[in-house]
Amino acid sequence: MSAPRDVVVVLLDSLNRHMLGAYGGTEFDTPNLDRLAARSVRFTNHHTGSLPCMPARHDLLVGALDFPWRPWGSIEIWEDAITTLLRQHAGVSTMLASDHPHLFETGGENYHVDFGAWDYLRGHEDDPWRTRPDPSWIGAPALSARRPTWERGYDVSRTWFRDEVDFPGPKTMVAAASWLDGELSAAREPHERALLVVDEFDPHEPFDTPEPWASRYDPDWNGDRLIWPPYARSQEQSGLTERESIHLRSQYGAKLSMIDHWLGRILEVVDQHDAWDTTAFILCTDHGHYLGEHGFWGKPQVAVHPELGHIPLLVSWPGAAPTTSGALTTTVDLHATLCDVFGVTPEHRTHGQSLVPILEGTASSVREWALCGVWGREVHVADATRTFAKAPVDENRPLSMFSNRWSTMPIRAIPGYRMPRPDERAWLDRSPGSDVPVIRQPFDPSDDIPFWGMGGFRGDVLYDREEADGGEFRNRSGGDADKEMTDLLVEALRTIEAPAEQLVRLGVG
């Protein structure tokens, strides 16, 4: 079995595993994802690591778990993205095609810079693309006014989308397919190789699509289209009626099916060049998105349940027969796999395990546990069949942020929100495997903390994933298995040399 010459990585944001045909979903159509799955190793035990969007990109592109040290931020000065390694040491042609606005704002501003080339396709979510609506037509739909002011920036961008191909998702897939076609058509030397990363923000909200997608799964809806899901920890808190909930879910499905359709453009390029025998194709996501399951909506401040954390992974590998793997895997393993394929070794500490032995059939597993979490919230550990979420104790303290970039997600939606800057409480510490001093800022209970860490805690959660996949969710915490899973959690945190205060705030230190 020969190693792939080229690699394509397509990350679809907020991709719900249980809604894909390849994973048993029947609610929405995903023919191209299903077509890819039919030629791939389909991983059924793949999980998020750091949440949400940018922490997950850090796991993928840098290979080090982010959430034990900080909430959301750019690449630190002691780290290198894999694209840096490929440029400096491997001579690989690298390309990023993306409509993901967080990659190009404070907190994500340097993930793209070491790609050989990058194409930012504008207009998704709150991307500040236009300052005024397109004055030449009145083609934008009447979007629901039930949304915060910051989200209305999308309405301005939306007036510039005249046809389906003008939407950010289709634009991104067309741009990626065009680049790949050019690369595979070029008269390359035998040593020339390529990595294409498609960071596609769909099916992330807003769940806005043109017809015929918009009415595909809810043709009887007569009101304004609802495209902005609430972030809520209960159905009551969401403010949605039962009928509105059904409609909003249908709009997620519309966006999922639309981006699946345009994904076909990239698959067609690989088909046309007969490049499957020389190309590894990885389809992944950062996390799922609650659409009313357990009463949750969006990505609220709750423990990570299967709909959010148990995610799809498809890998088409040259010479590998289509099959299913139940190996436990997580996002940092994709970084390790890319390093293995291209023969590069990071100098900074990483946490992934290459999946190449599984893909080539020489191993059935590469890890015994996987960590997952949001900075400042529960820490989760998964073994082969169970996931355990340990909730903080004692006011969730001590809690510190470790970073020299000191950039985090802009929180424009929360008036008056101010996260503390480094102050007299800060001191210089070290990150594992690095001699570079890093600012360590403690947070007091009176401090604002980053948005994703806000909210109360509901205690420990332990669930069997096979049960949960079958539609039955039972919190098994409180029994004899708690100690076993707590011991595994402590072992995992100590293995990655997480800050000792993580054990203290979780009540296990």
Report the location of each language-model feature.
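C-terminal, low-complexity/hydrophilic appendages and adjacent surface loops
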Residues: P306, V374-S477, G509
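Active-site-proximal N-terminal segment of extracellular/periplasmic enzymes that hydrolyze or transfer
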Residues: M1-T44, S50, R458, G471-K483
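Active-site regions of oxyanion-processing enzymes, predominantly non-cytosolic
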Residues: S2-V9, G108-D119, T149-S157, R162-D224, ...
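A long, amphipathic alpha-helix that forms part
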Residues: F167-R188, A232-F281, V341, A492
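Substrate-binding rim/cap in mid-to-C-terminal beta-strand-loop elements of soluble/periplasmic
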Residues: L60-V62, S238-R243, G264-E268, Q272, ...
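Short, solvent-exposed turn/loop segments enriched in Gly/Ser/Thr/Pro and often Arg
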Residues: Y23-G24, S40-L61, G73-E76, L96-G107, ...
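Catalytic-site neighborhoods of secreted/periplasmic enzymes
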Residues: D59-R162
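Histidine-centered active-site microenvironments of extracellular/periplasmic hydrolases
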Residues: F28, P206-W221, V269-A320, T330
